[in-house]
């Protein structure tokens, strides 16, 4: 079950992406989601299949969401993941003396 999908980047939130079936475009995305997501910016198109690996998403869940609701929203990683990679000096810069 291969799917051709378009992936859109959020202008409001770094690393937030919206997956939709290319044939449907944005028509199945709920109107209430777009104010939160912002005006979708097309990033690229991709052929998805159960065998394909995605960097941060479970391909089975993505395909299931595309079939059932017409879109899949990839949330950005938790802020804790960003903080883990900062040098100790930067983490303590604003600490009171």
UniProtKB/Swiss-Prot annotation:
Matches recorded under Pfam families: YcgL
InterPro entries: YcgL-like_sf (IPR038068), YcgL_dom (IPR027354)
Signal peptide interval: none
All residue ranges annotated as the YcgL domain in the record: 3-87
PANTHER family: PROTEIN YCGL
Protein name (database record): YcgL domain-containing protein PputGB1_4120
């Amino acid at each position: 079950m291969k799917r051709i999908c378009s992936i859109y980047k959020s202008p409001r939130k770094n690393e937030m992406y919206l997956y939709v079936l290319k044939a449907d475009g944005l028509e199945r995305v709920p109107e209430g989601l777009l104010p939160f997501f912002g005006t979708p910016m097309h990033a690229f198109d991709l052929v998805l299949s159960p065998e394909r690996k995605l960097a941060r998403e479970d391909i089975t869940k993505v395909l299931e969401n595309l079939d059932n609701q017409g879109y899949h929203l990839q949330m950005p990683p938790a802020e804790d993941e960003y903080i883990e990679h900062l040098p100790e000096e930067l983490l303590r810069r604003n600490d009171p003396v």
